[in-house]
Design a protein with these regions (language model features):
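Conserved class I S-adenosyl-L-methionine
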Residues: 1-32, 35-43
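Conserved SAM/SAH-binding beta-strand->alpha-helix loop
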Residues: 64-66
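Conserved SAM-binding loop of SAM-dependent methyltransferases across substrates and taxa
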Residues: 44-56
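Conserved SAM-binding strand-loop segment of SAM-dependent methyltransferases
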Residues: 78-82
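Residue-level preference for short coil/turn positions at secondary-structure junctions
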Residues: 33-34, 54
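Conserved SAM-binding loop
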Residues: 71-72
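Conserved SAM-binding motif I beta-strand of class I
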Residues: 57-62
Length: 82
């Protein structure tokens, strides 16, 4: 799947996978030591934003600019920066 596929998929205003982190990230977040976190293939940002709300310095990367734009909006709505 390429960037065009994901840009089309993330073009809708709603968050395809929701705004809450996935179960794995929610369960394991407390095990991540303080500091920088790199979130690869982050999509719409739900995991990155969750980690940022816990105080991590998060860099989110994805091939979809549409997904990253939604991630930035979600981060702003939660008062964090990714």
């Amino acid at each position: 799947m390429d960037a065009e596929f994901w840009n089309n998929r993330f073009a809708a205003p709603q968050y395809i996978y929701g705004e809450a982190p996935n179960a794995f990230v929610a369960e394991m977040a407390s095990q991540i030591p303080p500091g920088p976190v790199l979130c690869l293939a982050e999509g719409e940002g739900r995991n990155a934003v969750h980690l940022a709300t816990l105080g991590h310095r998060v860099t989110a990367v994805d091939q979809s600019e549409a997904g990253l734009a939604k991630a930035r909006r979600l981060a702003a709505a939660r008062g964090v920066k990714i």
